[in-house]
Amino acid sequence: MEPNIALIASLIGDQARSKMLTALMCGKALTATELALEADITAQTASSHLTKLVEGELLVVRKQGRHKYFQLKDHQVAELLEQLLTLSAAHSSATNSSTTNLSTSGASLKQSTGPAD
């Protein structure tokens, strides 16, 4: 069976799921309710997302009494998320820098293209 990068990317790429995965980076196991709060979604929506993450083998679930606790499957998942967070932060910095440079050069352009006397 060939690796399916697109599947993993789509699982991580959803904003609610990425928030839940990021919340689990602390190493603790959290309930669906706790993860729903982290992702700012309903418990029902969180349950659907968590099922996808478990089926996609990014999370494991364990029962303790009547509660289910979710945690990252292993260190490889944590390392992948850490790399994506680093890449995302670098990309955000580069994008903000480019936007600032464009805004500054646009302001200079407006100043230098005034009407001729």
Which residues make up each language-model segment?
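Alpha-helical residues within the helix-turn-helix
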Residues: 37, 54-55
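N-terminal functional module detector in eukaryotic proteins
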Residues: 49, 64-66
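Beta-hairpin "wing" of winged helix-turn-helix
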Residues: 55-64, 71
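Terminal, regulation- and interaction-focused segments at domain boundaries
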Residues: 107-117
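Conserved segment of winged-helix/HTH DNA-binding domains
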Residues: 3, 26, 69-109
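N-terminal helix-turn-helix DNA-binding core of bacterial DNA-binding proteins
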Residues: 3-42, 68-73
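Key DNA-contact positions within bacterial/archaeal DNA-binding proteins
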Residues: 44, 51
